[in-house]
């Protein structure tokens, strides 16, 4: 019974994060950001890696300052590194942690590009490309692959895709 109550509480946190994401996607960036900050204070720096990764990933998107966006994306990556498939499967059975990395590294590459740090951007776009094989051939996977390709071209990495 205690385990079921704990699972319900964890699911409640993911629901609350999802509600803040919906606010942001609906155009209310400031309200979403405020809710994310409140949730982050509940979760804490050492809280559940799934909660930290998910929240930080979406909180980064609400940032206007690229330095702040980078800080949140780095938090998301750090939390993903702590996340296990076992924990993730408690929330969503068909997802593996390795499937997070293409998007996480793509976001970091974009952050570094905005900050005019091309070597760091290239490093992360290469890591995104290396991890992209973990994604399904579906709308999400296709979108991430396309975004990686666009950023590779912007960073001058597009030639790495040509096979002779």
Can you say where each PLM-predicted feature lies in the sequence?
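Conserved small/polar residues in nucleotide/adenosyl-binding loops
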Residues: 162-164
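Flexible helix-coil transition and linker loops at the boundaries of alpha-helical arrays
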Residues: 3-6, 42-47, 81-97, 135-138
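TPR repeat positional signature
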Residues: 16, 52-56, 105, 124
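Structural signature of alpha-solenoid helical repeat junctions
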Residues: 11, 28-31, 47-51, 68, ...
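Alpha-helical adaptor scaffolds
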Residues: 54-98
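TPR/TPR-like (Sel1-like) alpha-helical repeat modules
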Residues: 70-82, 114-136
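Alpha-helical segment of the N-proximal tetratricopeptide repeat
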Residues: 14-34, 41
């Amino acid at each position: 019974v205690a385990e079921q109550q704990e699972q319900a509480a964890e699911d409640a946190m993911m629901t609350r994060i999802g509600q803040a994401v919906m606010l942001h996607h609906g155009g209310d960036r400031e309200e979403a950001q405020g809710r994310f900050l409140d949730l982050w204070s509940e979760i804490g720096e050492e809280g559940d890696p799934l909660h930290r990764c998910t929240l930080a990933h979406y909180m980064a998107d609400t940032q206007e300052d690229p330095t702040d966006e980078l800080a949140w994306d780095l938090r998301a990556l750090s939390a993903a590194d702590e996340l296990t498939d076992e924990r993730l499967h408690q929330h969503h059975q068909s997802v593996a942690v390795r499937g997070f990395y293409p998007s996480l590294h793509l976001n970091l590459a974009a952050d570094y590009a905005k900050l005019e740090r091309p070597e760091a951007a290239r490093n992360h776009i290469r890591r995104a490309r290396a991890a992209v094989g973990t994604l399904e051939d579906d709308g999400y996977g296709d979108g991430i692959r396309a975004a990686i390709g666009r950023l590779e071209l912007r960073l001058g990495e597009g030639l790495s895709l040509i096979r002779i």
